[in-house]
A protein has these predicted regions:
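Arg/Lys-rich, positively charged N-terminal/basic patches that mediate binding to nucleic acids
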Residues: 1-28
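Enriched for short, Lys/Arg-rich terminal
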Residues: 2, 7, 19, 58-62, ...
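Active-site micro-motifs of SAM-dependent methyltransferase domains
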Residues: 11, 31, 83
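A short, surface-exposed loop/turn module that caps and links secondary-structure elements
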Residues: 30-55
Length: 89
């Protein structure tokens, strides 16, 4: 899949210094890039009530992204699970 990053996603990543957590985020992004379809992405869930918005679970953290086209996704936010649904979508 074609992966794009919002400035808000990159800015939210800068808040975290935990190398293990950032490695897991990198692995999740790599999984998205190599995936043929959304079904191939682990820990993925569609957000109810929204047509093209999904989240990827990484422990207590979430990555929020939007499906722009069939094979193109845009990462929007990375934050703790208690905050993701306040800020996304």
């Amino acid at each position: 899949m074609d992966v794009r990053f919002d400035k808000s996603f990159l800015k939210s990543l800068e808040k975290y210094n935990d190398i293990n957590l950032l490695n897991k985020v990198d692995k999740a992004i790599s999984n998205c890039e190599s995936a043929e379809s959304l079904k191939d992405i682990p820990n993925l869930k569609k957000l109810s009530g929204f047509k093209n918005y999904y989240r990827i679970k990484i422990g207590s953290y979430r990555i929020g992204f939007e499906l722009i086209q069939k094979r193109q996704i845009r990462f929007i936010i990375f934050t703790h699970r208690k905050d993701i649904y306040k800020k996304f979508p």
